[in-house]
Amino acid sequence: MEFTDRNYTLVTEFILLGFPTRPELQIVLFLMFLTLYAIILIGNIGLMLLIRIDPHLQTPMYFFLSNLSFVDLCYFSDIVPKMLVNFLSENKSISYYGCALQFYFFCTFADTESFILAAMAYDRYVAICNPLLYTVVMSRGICMRLIVLSYLGGNMSSLVHTSFAFILKYCDKNVINHFFCDLPPLLKLSCTDTTINEWLLSTYGSSVEIICFIIIIISYFFILLSVLKIRSFSGRKKTFSTCASHLTSVTIYQGTLLFIYSRPSYLYSPNTDKIISVFYTIFIPVLNPLIYSLRNKDVKDAAEKVLRSKVDSS
C-alpha cells in the first residue's frame, strides 16, 4: 500500500479472488483449464500454420479466420496463465500496473474479435449473396484494411476504458472478486466517483458490441434469404448448417459480453459474472477452431494432405 496525506492508503497491488474452493478442487480446476489451454494452443496455432502453408486456403475467409485464431490465442493467453498460477499459489496478487496491462490487452482483443467476427459475416454475405462481385468487393487490399481497422478499433476502445479506469483512486480495498482484472469488479473497489466509467461502459463499450452484432445479424439475414432460394436440399442443408454454427458461436460471445457490460451497475453480481465470463474468455476460444474449421471440408482436406506428406516423408 502507498500512504497519502489523507486517512487512506492507495492500492499498489490487487488480489484476484478467482474461484475460492477447497485445495483439492483447485487442482482439478488447474488440470481442466491447463487442458483447455493446450487445446487452444494446438488448435489455433495449427489452424494458422495450415492456412499459411496451403495455397487453397489463401482466400479472404481464411485470412479472417487466421486473424481470429491469433486474437483468440492472445485473448486466452492474457488471462489463463495467471489464473493457472493462482490455482497452485497462495499468493494471488497482481501488481497495479500488471492489472492495468491485463485489462488493456483483454479489452483490446475482446473488441478486436467482435470487429473481426463482423468482417467475417460480411465476407460470407458477399460470397453467398453476390458471388460474381466477391473477388472485387473482398480484394486483398480491402481485407487488409478491414483487419487493420479491427485492430485499431479494439485498441482505441481499450485505451479509453483503461485510461479512465486507472486514473481512479483505489484505496484500502484491493480484493477483486474475479479471476482476472475486469472492469465491473474493479470499479467496485474505487474510492472515487465512477459515474463516468459506468456511463462509458454501458454506452460506448456496449455500442461497439451492438454495432458489430447488428452487422452480423443483417448479414446472416440476407444469407438466410439466399439459402432458402437454393433448390438442392443437400446444398441448402450444408450452407444453413455452416451459417447456423457460426451464428451460434457469435450469439454466445456477443450475448455474454452485452450482458456483462451493458446492464446497470446495480444488477452487478460477482459470482454470476465469473461463471458467464468463463464462456466468452475460455470456452469460445476453444469452440471457434472447432466451429470454423473442423466442420469445413477445405480445412480437413488441407490437414489430411499435410499429414500424408509427413507420413510419406518419414
UniProtKB/Swiss-Prot annotation:
Indicate the principal place this protein occupies in or around the cell: membrane
Question: Where does the record locate the signal sequence feature?
Answer: none
Where does it reside?
Cell membrane
What is any one of the record's Gene Ontology cellular component terms? plasma membrane
Residue intervals on the Extracellular side:
1-27, 78-101, 163-198, 261-273
Which residue ranges are assigned to the Cytoplasmic compartment in the record's topology? 49-56, 123-141, 220-239, 295-314
Question: Which GO BP terms sit in this record?
Answer: G protein-coupled receptor signaling pathway; sensory perception of smell; signal transduction
Q: Which UniProt keywords apply?
A: Cell membrane, Disulfide bond, G-protein coupled receptor, Glycoprotein, Membrane, Olfaction, Receptor, Sensory transduction, Transducer, Transmembrane, Transmembrane helix
The glycosylation sites are 7
Topological relation to the membrane, as annotated: Multi-pass membrane protein
- State the Pfam families in the record: 7tm_4
InterPro entries from the UniProt entry: GPCR_Rhodpsn, GPCR_Rhodpsn_7TM, Olfact_rcpt
For this chain, the annotated S-S bridges are 99-191
Q: Which PANTHER family match?
A: OLFACTORY RECEPTOR
Give the record's family classification. Belongs to the G-protein coupled receptor 1 family.
Task: Please report the name of this protein according to its UniProt entry.
Answer: Olfactory receptor 5I1
Species this protein is from: Homo sapiens (Human)
State which gene encodes it: OR5I1
